[in-house]
Regions:
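Generic structural "secondary-structure junction" signal
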Residues: 10, 20, 24-26, 70-73, ...
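Long, amphipathic alpha-helical surface segments
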Residues: 51, 88-164
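N-terminal mature-domain "stem" immediately C-terminal to a signal peptide or N-terminal signal-anchor/transmembrane
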Residues: 2-5, 16
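Residue-level detector of buried hydrophobic side-chain packing
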Residues: 18, 79-80, 127
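Alpha-helical segment that forms one wall of the substrate-binding/catalytic cleft
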Residues: 32-67, 73-91, 99-111
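Substrate-binding/active-site groove segments that recognize
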Residues: 12-34, 54
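Surface-exposed patches in mature extracellular/periplasmic domains of secreted proteins
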Residues: 5-10, 62-76, 124-130
Length: 164
């Protein structure tokens, strides 16, 4: 269990969050309608909101990654988890910051999704490496922001993306 469900709002980097890390200020009217009391969220309410959020995220991934349907379950889980935590636009490199923390990551994923055999495996391995470690323009290696804030999650998702 990487993160549990929190019934009571708590402070984090997004302000106040509740449930499975839902920033209260960013809950949509549709999502808020599923919650009786945002100050004491029930697990079934949080699960309903989570389903909406994940369904939207998956639809976006399907639109943006050609061959999404060929990606194996564990690898999809890793990509979905990463996108849920960091924002799908950041993972897909379509946000204003253009995925500055892993500049080659999504390129490897997209190429792997339409490749086969050893090439596919090699590309997923490269993408998994990018989750953890990057190289700057001067050739210096550094840990990604994601790894630094949630190392256990990053390492687990790294293994899943590798197909292990």
């Amino acid at each position: 269990d990487l993160e549990g469900m929190e019934s009571i709002p708590y402070q984090d980097g997004n302000g106040r969050s509740v449930g499975y890390g839902f920033a209260i200020a960013h809950l949509t009217p549709e999502e808020l309608a599923l919650i009786e009391n945002v100050e004491n969220v029930k697990e079934e309410e949080a699960n309903a909101v989570l389903k909406i959020k994940v369904d939207k995220l998956i639809k976006k991934m399907e639109r943006e990654i050609e061959g999404w349907e060929t990606i194996e379950g564990g690898r999809k889980l890793a990509l979905i988890s990463m996108a849920f935590q960091l924002g799908v636009e950041n993972v897909l490199a379509i946000s204003p910051n253009k995925s500055k923390n892993w500049p080659r990551f999504i390129g490897y994923v997209k190429e792997a999704a339409v490749s086969k055999g050893m090439k596919r495996e090699s590309l997923f391995k490269k993408a998994a490496d990018e989750m953890i470690l990057n190289v700057n323009s001067r050739g210096h290696k550094f840990k990604t922001y994601w790894y630094n804030i949630t190392p256990k999650r990053a390492l687990l998702m790294n293994q899943l993306l590798r197909g292990l």
